[in-house]
């Protein structure tokens, strides 16, 4: 069974420690998205697509720093690509990270001692291993995780 790991990093304060893991064992949809509670705390969502895309919602009145990415456990040399979209409150596309056109790379996570496929990110490119957060206006945002057949 393959699970994707979806990171949301939203920073509204200057202190950021380790992320909070959250297991998503249902399929949050656009009408009932998974609420990102306390968005100022970095989160890692663990989920599995079972025929429908997953939706997450961030409601934040204040401007904040935003970053999101996707990882998938590396169980063999093949990966299932996944994409990310950020939509505004009217479900208009704001940002897209197309996993089908992304060069997925193997990445070792030293704390968990696990290998992952590192997928696309929505952030500011850096010279580092991962992109960084960028300023975004306060408001309501939906994050969609999907692929062609919504499995993985």
Question: What kind of feature is each model-predicted range?
Answer:
Residues 19-30, 79, 104-105, 148-150:
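Juxtadomain low-complexity/linker regions and immediately adjacent membrane-anchoring helices
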Residues 13-15:
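N-terminal signal peptide c-region/cleavage motif recognized by signal peptidases
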Residues 55-75, 141-148:
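Hydrophobic beta-strand segments within beta-rich accessory/binding domains
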Residues 17-55:
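Non-catalytic extracellular/lumenal accessory regions of secreted precursors
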Residues 35-41, 52-54, 61-69, 105-126:
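Mature extracellular "passenger" or substrate-interacting domains of secreted, surface-exposed proteins
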Residues 6-10:
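Hydrophobic helical h-region of N-terminal Sec-dependent signal peptides
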Residues 81-152:
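Noncatalytic accessory or regulatory domains flanking protease catalytic cores in secreted, cell-surface
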Residues 1-5:
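Positively charged n-region of N-terminal signal peptides that target proteins for export
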């Amino acid at each position: 069974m393959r699970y994707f790991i979806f990171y949301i990093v939203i920073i509204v304060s200057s202190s950021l420690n380790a992320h909070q893991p959250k297991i998503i064992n249902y399929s949050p949809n656009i009408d009932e998205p998974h609420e990102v509670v306390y968005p100022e705390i970095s989160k890692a969502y663990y989920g599995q697509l079972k025929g429908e895309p997953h939706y997450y919602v961030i409601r934040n009145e204040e401007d904040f720093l935003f970053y999101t990415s996707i990882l998938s456990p590396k169980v063999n040399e093949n990966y299932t690509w996944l994409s990310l979209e950020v939509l505004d409150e009217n479900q208009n596309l704001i940002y897209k990270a197309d996993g089908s056109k992304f060069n997925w790379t193997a990445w070792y996570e030293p704390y968990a001692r696990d290998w992952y496929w590192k997928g696309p990110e929505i952030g500011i490119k850096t010279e580092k291993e991962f992109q960084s957060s960028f300023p975004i206006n306060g408001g309501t945002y939906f994050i969609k995780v999907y692929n062609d057949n919504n499995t993985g």
